[in-house]
Amino acid sequence: MSCICLKNEKLNVINQVKRFIKKYCKSTQPLLLALSGGADSLSLFYCLLACRLEGILSFHVAHVDHGWREESAKEATILKNLAEQHQVPYHQLKIDLSQLAGNLEDACRKQRQKFFKEICLQNNLQAVCLGHQENDQVETVLKRILEGSHWSHFDGLKERMWHDQVQFLRPLLGIQKDEILAFLKGNQLKAFEDGTNCDERFMRARMRRTIIPDLNRSFGKKIDNSLVYIASEMSELKNFFLGRVSPLLGQIVKGPFGVYLNLANHPSIDLVEIKYLLRLISEQELFFLSRQILQRASEAIEKLEPQLSFEMGTKKIVIDRGHFFILSKKTACKNPNLQISGSSLQYYGKWMIKTNESFYHQNLQASTWLDGWRGYLKTYLPLDKYVLGQASKHAKLLRHHSTINKWWSSHHVPPFLRSFFPVIWQHNEIAHEFLTGLERQNLQEGEKCLQIELSYLT
């Protein structure tokens, strides 16, 4: 790993990386290279050196010592010396496996991502470069197909992606492993060898050493190009569907209780689009749906079915006549009654209650359940004493013949929401409910009134 003059005879690795960097990167900001010392990341290190030499851009190096192998500490020192030799800023993280719990691979991945993000923010770096190449793409796509993943995941690894406000780039994704090894050999560069890459106890090793070679022999040709083609086609299809549902994604309402989307007013949306949309929203909210639930939920939305729900862990999906909810927690209103009058600031569970005297204007509107979903409710009542509390199904509305439950049903208030928000009582009847936005108090323009505001504290 000494300082050498790179050769590029009949090899296009450097030129492909240069084209990639010019396509996606700004020359004014450095990159961060995740350097393990393996063949892929080492070749990328020297390609980025070539880019720096031509003034295309500069870069930093980040190495993570997982401590999985005895030689890892020695390798970290070698990489540190390599970076210093070429005057490349070097950053290192040593992971203490004894401090991690649960799935070690997942825990280490989160540690790496956190480490990379910190370096990028501290040094104003534009992206993290990863060493994945075409063979990694082939293995990823085949694995997802065999696992029965959703088709939207068949696009495999991305050349460019964002995660947790950090951009990740894969300049080698269109280059085969053989080309990378030839590049290293032609320049007399020796990479570290990770024994786990050949250990068939690991799925990746079995894919590389047994499954894919066996498929090649069985088909009588290499399947690599076919799988890369599938990834490309699925990427185009995914972008098409994303374009179709993007306007709906912009209509999502998020609040302290979860996520809401009204699909009742979009009769032209197809079932396959609904399925993709629900999966996309659910994955963004870390609420992963089984195939059966996804199919049933999508059909319920398409048919505008009432009151369907699914519970998974601490979250819950509710579908009601085309309205789609993901609830983040149980939020039924079970607080003791609260006396309200005059100007005051009080608390009703997680609701902050602010009351003050004001003057009524006809252009003032009371809140609806959608406002409540966002965590804010407001209304205006005649000056008097009231009680804030939970509604009961058979309670009567003040100056109205209907029960509260019939009133809400006639105005299509989703049943599960009715226990989320308090009502205002007076003389054992409900003086105001917040879910329909309808006023029944006959306040006159300019009349002095009691303004009541509820804000949900998260």
From Swiss-Prot:
Record GO cellular component, one term: cytoplasm
Database matches in InterPro entries: Rossmann-like_a/b/a_fold, TilS/TtcA_N, tRNA_Ile_lys_synt, tRNA_Ile_lys_synt_N
NCBIfam families linked to this entry: lysidine_TilS_N
Protein biosynthesis among keywords: no
Pfam families given in the database record: ATP_bind_3 (PF01171)
Catalytic activity: cytidine(34) in tRNA(Ile2) + L-lysine + ATP = lysidine(34) in tRNA(Ile2) + AMP + diphosphate + H(+)
Species of origin: Protochlamydia amoebophila (strain UWE25)
Family: Belongs to the tRNA(Ile)-lysidine synthase family.
Protein name (record): tRNA(Ile)-lysidine synthase
